[in-house]
Amino acid sequence: MKQLHPQFGFNTLAVHAGSAPDPATGARSFPIYQTTSYVFDDADHAASLFNLQAPGFIYSRLTNPTVAALEEKLATLEGGRGGTVTSSGQAAETLALFPLMAPGMEVIVANKLYGGTINLMGKSYQKFGWNAIFVDSENPEAFRQAVTKKTRAIFIESLANPGGVVMDIESIAKVANEAGVPLVVDNTMATPFLCQPMEWGADLVVHSTTKFLSGQGNAVGGVVIDSGKFTWLENSKFPSLSTPSPEYNGLTFAETFGDLAFTMYSHAISLRDLGCSQSPMNAWITLNGIETLPLRVERHCSNGLTVAKYLEKHPSVEWVSHAGLESSPYYKLGKKYMPDGTGSVFTFGVKGGYESGLKMLESVELFSHVANIGDTRSLILHPASTTHRQLTEEQRIAAGSGPEVIRLSIGIECAEDIIADLDQALKSLG
């Protein structure tokens, strides 16, 4: 693809980055390359590809033209050097840590996270010998105090799911920098339209592309984006990137590929061995979804804040956690990191606790009761009985998912219709 003007705005890049006309046919909509493999020119060409000496495509578990277009688009929008698209957001988190971790090593993790991530890091990673150290999300000093010689990464969400907690990315990035480890930020809830964590010091950014990026609840996927700024050769903590790789005749990724080292490793080894590749069809759906991302997110944010203000005044509601409300303890951080809006996913507490929460779900009509977020449709969930069900009560409360909590993902419908549906459901609680 020809080089885009560096001064193009976000909306322009969302449409054009990574999406050149098809060179074979001239088709303007980027094609779906639904293939497993690619014909080599000759034996030397095949050898150069397998030796990582030439760019190109080998097998769609590693690389695919449609997937590569999505990687370029997402890396551009996040201000990164390269990207690796995966089969899901959970896979992206694992791929982000895979080159960094080893048995016995630690990752410091914010305690306010998506429930699936807490399970993944707190339980499943133990089978790899990786140890997750959970700390208070709202206290950067807690991250500093948790650093040890075994620390290999710090992981946070820019805007925590489900509670809408805005993380102090800049302060935590300083802790990671002092410790000599990468800061990994999950930017799913904010999207690069609202927040670009790399501007605040993040080294790696992950997304569940399933959510706002694809935008219509029809394509599962994830991505890891590398800033290209972390200096892997400065210490011995990351031998996967800084020492010779026997699989590739002693090639050292950091020396050979420089600021693309992490991305090249992710394709050549992580995807090769873990196999968590995204299908070309899902990549194509997401490519098309991103073209309207700015328009959708503006409406999501506008509707979300309108609904939050309505709920804040409702007699059946105990509290509302939305960083766009002036009453929110995260209001100032929201203005700093997400000046154009703090998203449309937030929580509120219904009076009556667990049972009222379940009744609320059964009383809505416009809302869909699903586990997804970031859809054009308005969605509702009771985290304590679903996404955070496997956690202990203490973990649920720490993550902002107590028994009374309802999570909303506000869609792009008419705000007055969304409010009317919530109003009739709240009235049914008595």
What does each model-identified segment do?
Residues 2-5, 14-16, 20-23, 83-314:
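Conserved PLP-enzyme active-site core in the AAT-like
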Residues 2-64, 72:
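N-terminal "arm"/small-domain region of PLP-dependent enzymes with the aminotransferase-like
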Residues 19-21, 34-40, 211, 228-229, ...:
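Glycine-rich beta-alpha junction loops
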Residues 42-94, 116-123:
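Conserved N-terminal alpha-helix of the aminotransferase class I/II PLP-enzyme fold
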